[in-house]
Amino acid sequence: MSFELSAPVPLSDNSEAILEKEIGETVKIEGDLVEVYEINRTVDFIKSGNYNSVALQFPDEHLADSGKVASILTNLVEANVQILADTNYGSCCVDEVAAEHMSADAIVHYGRACLSPTSRLPVLYVFGRLPINLHKLEKCLTIPLDQNILLVSDTRWYYAQDSILKSLKTLGYQNVYESHLKERIEPNLEEASTSYTIPGRTYSLPKSLSLQDMTLLYIGPDSPTLSSILMSHYSLVNQFLSFDPLSNKIVEESSFTGAKLRRRYALVQRCRDAGVIGIVIGTLGVHRYLHVLNQLRKMILNAGKKPYMLAVGKLNPAKLANFQEIECFVLIACGENSLIDSKEFYRPIVTPFELVKALSSDMSWNNDFILSFDEVLKLSEGKQSKEPSEVLTEESAEPHFSLITGKFVNSTPMRHLDVTLETADAKNNDSSSASIEKRGMRSLAVNGVYSPAAAFLQSKSWSGLDSVDEGEGPSKLYEGQSGIAKGYVGEGSKEKIQRDFGK
């Protein structure tokens, strides 16, 4: 089937398209803006902190109300109020870098949030309030009345958690325990003394109960928040239920999580087989992200692999496909943005916890899943292997059996090799550090270290149909013909025939 083109195919986008782009998803706010955006609480936050400049961070779906909210706050406080949108990474994260560019000394974050601890600026969260039908929830909940319930809510339905708690107790559920959000976060300049299983949320249970005795009831739709809590609590609780206030349906998530964890474990195996790993920076504001970056880089080097550090902003398959030599990516981001479904990507993308598992000698996994940076750092320090000088020799780099390819794989490209350099410079100066030895026209060793970048370049270079024999000398040089095609000088003569074909 063919089509006729009425105009040339555009090879580039219109530069004005981004300015004319309409926001696809806009949330219609019903009710008074002062109540919905919690203006009074925001004013108290600004005045109590004596802030001179405040950044209002809005997600795309709430940008339509940003001007009105900023105008109301400007009339109520003396601080300079500025609007912040189009964040470099996920809208659930606080964009401290953009706020500092605006010389802001505090941030008010609107909409759904991952509640990751910040490192420099104080933050006030305004989650918003979406409706919920408690009668539908009561009708859908059919678990036994003597069940222990841990109530966890999406940030946008957190306001209704007290009403939900009362409704459950009215039904006869007396053993209900709720989690609490940290709606105001101060920057963590020192190491956190307490780590929470759910980032930004706290809950307490009686000493006689453990999480294995609990049924976790999550209030909210399918979202990155649900995925992060589900992955981190799948092996900790007895049962996991989620109620979607938008569709008024309740789902038992436990039956689906096992398959998700198996897919994540397959990514860990592919990461273990990788020799070149890219560390993608997905946040610049989450507390201790630099510590995680440095620790992962050290672990990759100690494992004999090659690390590359990348900062590409918001991820998409086209960006990461430019780095073909990288075999696996690890994303350093908040707990909600780090769980990437890498089916559309050219290479697998894992979390810092999964990378630590892949690089450790003990590959056992009991379905635990860690997203907190503090917990990942503790685990990585415990899994820290020997120094590279102790393990990265060609003799000790034993291959491992890959469950993905079914073959033995040696994924330590940065191992140190004992290379004998035979170049002219090396003979004159044995200490020369710039000498390169080419082995069989296929691999390169620089300073005695195998270079994966050079090997990848060699694999992409065209070497011809026949292999080059290094011992073959140059061909003998003969004088060519002269003249025109109709008749070359000396063509057909006895002397030329004898010269070309021999006697």
Curated annotation (Swiss-Prot):
Cofactor(s), names only, from the UniProt record: [4Fe-4S] cluster
Disulfide feature: none
Signal peptide (residue range): none
Keywords: Cytoplasm, Iron, Iron-sulfur, Metal-binding
Protein residues bound to [4Fe-4S] cluster: C93, C114, C334
Region described as Disordered: 464-503
One GO BP: protein histidyl modification to diphthamide
Pathway noted in the entry: Protein modification; peptidyl-diphthamide biosynthesis
GO molecular function annotations of the record: 2-(3-amino-3-carboxypropyl)histidine synthase activity; 4 iron, 4 sulfur cluster binding; metal ion binding
The record's free-text note on cofactor binding: Binds 1 [4Fe-4S] cluster per subunit. The cluster facilitates the reduction of the catalytic iron-sulfur cluster in the dph1 subunit.
Basic and acidic residues bias spans: 492-503
Keyword Secreted: no
Highest taxon, organism lineage: Eukaryota
Subunit and interaction comment: Component of the 2-(3-amino-3-carboxypropyl)histidine synthase complex composed of dph1, dph2, dph3 and a NADH-dependent reductase, predominantly cbr1.
NCBIfam families: diphth2_R, DPH2
Primary role: Required for the first step of diphthamide biosynthesis, a post-translational modification of histidine which occurs in elongation factor 2. Dph1 and dph2 transfer a 3-amino-3-carboxypropyl (ACP) group from S-adenosyl-L-methionine (SAM) to a histidine residue, the reaction is assisted by a reduction system comprising dph3 and a NADH-dependent reductase, predominantly cbr1. Facilitates the reduction of the catalytic iron-sulfur cluster found in the dph1 subunit.
The protein, known as: 2-(3-amino-3-carboxypropyl)histidine synthase subunit 2
UniProt source species: Schizosaccharomyces pombe (strain 972 / ATCC 24843) (Fission yeast)
Gene it is expressed from: dph2
